[in-house]
Each structure stands twice: as C-alpha cells, then as structure tokens.
Amino acid sequence: MFGIFKRSTVVRKSEDNFVKSETKWFKGQKVKIKSGTTSTRSFHKKNQRKASRQTWFREKPLPVPEVEKKQMLISYKGGSSKIAILEGATLVEYYSAESKTKSLVGNIYLGKVKNVLPGMEAAFVSFGEEKNGVLYVADVSNSRRNSKIEHLLNKDQEILVQVVKDAMGEKGARLTGQISFPGRYMVLIPNSNTKGISRRLPDEERGRLDKIIRKIKPEGFGVIVRTAAEGVNEASLKSDIDKLIIEWEKVSKNNQGSAPILIHEEPDISVKVIREHLGTNFKKLLIEGGKHFEEIKEYINETSPELNEIIEAYNDELDLFERYHIEDQIKKALDRKVWLPSGGHLIIDRTEALTVIDVNTGKFVGKDSLEQTVYENNLEASEEIARQLRLRDIGGIIVIDFIDMESVKRQEELLNKFKQELAKDKTRTQVFNISRLGLVEMTRKNVSAGLIESFSEECEECNGRGLIINDIFSNNSIEDNLLESDAVVE
C-alpha cells in the first residue's frame, strides 16, 4: 500500500573511478588488474570494509633499511660447524651442528605409510626416525582440491617424502610429497608448472628475470627465482637449474630399496647457510679450519665466483668466535631479559602455544615528556625484537606488548619501523595492526628448533613449568595425622 512512497534508488557514477587496466606483481607473478566505474555508494562501502580488515605485512614488504656491511664467520673447531652472521659487531644469526638435534629439513626419504587418518586429513609416515612424520592431504604430490587422504594413500604404501619442518616437542616432523631442490639462485620443483620470483626484488629486476625464466625453464619442472638472483646473468641461472636437474635425476635413480631409507641428504650446515645468505652485501667470509677452507672456496667458485675476493682463512692464535665475542652474545640471547641501549628492557617468554614479548621502560626515564619517552623506548624495542627473533630463531605465533601510546600517528610510525626491521629477516613473517588491547600480533615461519630449545634441557624439578608447588598440602596432612595420633593416645 505504501509502496508508492518508497524512495527510488539513484545510482550515481563516480567520475574518479574510471576504467583502467594495469599489470602488477603478486606473489612473484605478473597479474592483470582491472578497475571500472562503480557507484559512489558501493565504492564507499568497499573502502569501509577494506579499512576494517587487518593488514598483512606480506602484501607489500617495506624496503630493507641500510645496514653496515655483513660478515660471516665459520668455525670448524671441536669437530663441529658453527656459523655466525654479524651486522657491524652485532650477532644477528647463529647456526650450529653441535646442538642436541641435527636439522633434517630438506632431506628426502623413501617412506612407508603407517596410518591413514581421514578425520585429520593426514597420514603418518615412517621415514627412519624415532617419531613418524605427518603428511597432510594438501602436501601429497598428486593432491587436488577437495581430495580425500584415503583415496590418495594406503597403509604400507611406499612414498617419496621431504622434510619441511623438524620434529618439535611431542610433534613429529612435517613432511611433503611435493619435492623441491634449492640452489644458489633457483628452487627447482619436479612435476610442477610453478613459476615464481622473489617479492623482495624490485619490479624492474623481476621483469628482467621473468623474461629469462620463460626461455630457460625446463619442461615438466617448476622454478622459483630467489633473491640472490638479482643481477645474475642468464648463463649462471641456466647453470644453476642444470645442477638441480642432475640432483633430481640422482634421486629418481636411487628411489629403490626397502623403505624407510634416506635418498638425498642436504649438505653440511655451513654450505646451507652460505647458499641461503651469502651475497654481495657481505664484506668478509672468515673460515677457521684449514681443511674446510678449500672446500668452501671451491663451492663458492662454482656457484658465485664474484664472491671469491671476500673469502679469508683465519689462522690467528685467538679463537675466531672469541675475537668477535660471539659466545658472550649467545649467552645473552639465552636470557629471559634483554636490555635496551637506553635502559629499557624486554621480557621474552616461550610457551607451547606462542611467544610473548613484554616491553618495559626499566631504567629509561627520558628527557622531554612521558609520551616521548615511551615512543623512543618502543622504537628501540622494535629494532631489538626483530633482531632477537632472528638470533633466537623464534617461530610460530608471537604477541608483543609495546608500551601504550595514545597517538595513532606514533602507533603507525612504530609499526612501520618494526616492519622495516623485519624486512632484514629472510624467514617469512606476517604482521597485523595494533589490536584494541594495544598488542601487536605476528607470525614467523617455524622450521626448526630455536636457539633455546637447541641448547637447553627441561628442568627435572618443575618439568619445564618454571615453578615448584609449595609443600603446604603435604605438611598439613602430616600435622593432621599427628593430631589424630595424639587424640588416640589420650
């Protein structure tokens, strides 16, 4: 009845939203994005929804801030390999083969399926270690969307798997059937059509590499171009791919025998670290241990001859790590409390579910105002937190309680500063906006045990809880028994 009074809908076209088409880089690949004319009302609604969402750091990595030239130190003393990466005189990353567990990440095995669990959409695979590894349906080599694990795998079936995450605590290693071979400049993925380029590279360089990859990509293989490929010529990239294809052919030929059996083992940890990290931004590579110097030099000469000039043998009487105070910095990295330059401090606590980092002003009293003091302390903390995450190799969910700031502008500046510091980290991170409670939530890819887990044991007294329950209950029961016995005597 009252329909005639219903307000008619007027759709106005926004002149600002003209039709356009542009090519952008997304997840290492070129994509074409079209935007057209839309109504003003829907345009504003879309912007409101967009503003209400959390922003992920992965979408647009900020440029890596300028840092002092890096150094890499490798020591082979004591029958084990130890590697330190320094920015200036500060230790930022540490790797060792002397820890209680050796990383298996990257190793390829012929495994045997022990259990198929449809309820978990996963299978447990025996691959030669004490604990079986877990293989999720999405990681099975021939898996498709909505595939069922029970349709892909059977009990006692032999399957080629690769370790992508070491066993931690009660959890076994995580496995994948989608095998990949990392090289100096490329990652080769057999039986795949994947083509990707590192998002850390500038657009112009990604365009150059994209043209090269279209020419040299082998049929039946996927390739991912790494950050180290920046400025590398076509011949070097082709050589890297050819070496990786040879590795795959060896694995294919050796894929025989009785499972479980190791098929392909990753190289020594020093070679892995050089492969993943060493680049033109390093000013020196010092190697302590005569017989290993020639091996490393030969590897670099084959893969990155332009870095030959930075390699040096260290033969001084004073230990290499002692000269650069590496062990002192490692000991500090195992502490719960971390002091900041101006007197503030961090408290870092690990739990089964996540890592919590609390920021405090401590001895820092500032000069101008409370707001400025808190702001400066938070900026110092953001830089140190990013370094501690790398040094301690902390992964998983991380929650940071910065000191509260009322200024929204300064909150944004703090978050941008933190993201810039994280851009130095090769491990993938995702950062959310500051929550309503003033917390910064983030994740960091968890691949292997961190520094503390590698060089510590669970306390026998408290079973890792960090506290011991008082004996008040047992004492009360003793007193009650004594009182009862006295009553009986009377």
Predicted segments with their positions:
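Conserved interaction-surface patches within small, structured recognition/assembly domains
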Residues: L104-V116, L379-R390
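Conserved P-loop/Walker A NTP-binding site and adjacent catalytic elements of P-loop NTPases
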Residues: V92-A97, Y109, F127-G128, G133
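Short nucleic-acid-contacting surface segments enriched for D/E, G, S/T with interspersed K/R
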Residues: G106, N146-L160
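OB-fold/S1-family RNA-binding modules
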Residues: M1-A97, V113, N154-L346, T351, ...
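Conserved glycine-centered short motifs in functionally critical loops
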Residues: E121-V125, K131-N132, V163-I189, K195, ...
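A short macromolecule-binding patch
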Residues: K131-S141, L188, D240
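Conserved nucleotide-binding/hydrolysis modules and their immediate coupling elements
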Residues: S96-K100, L110-V113, P118, D139-I149
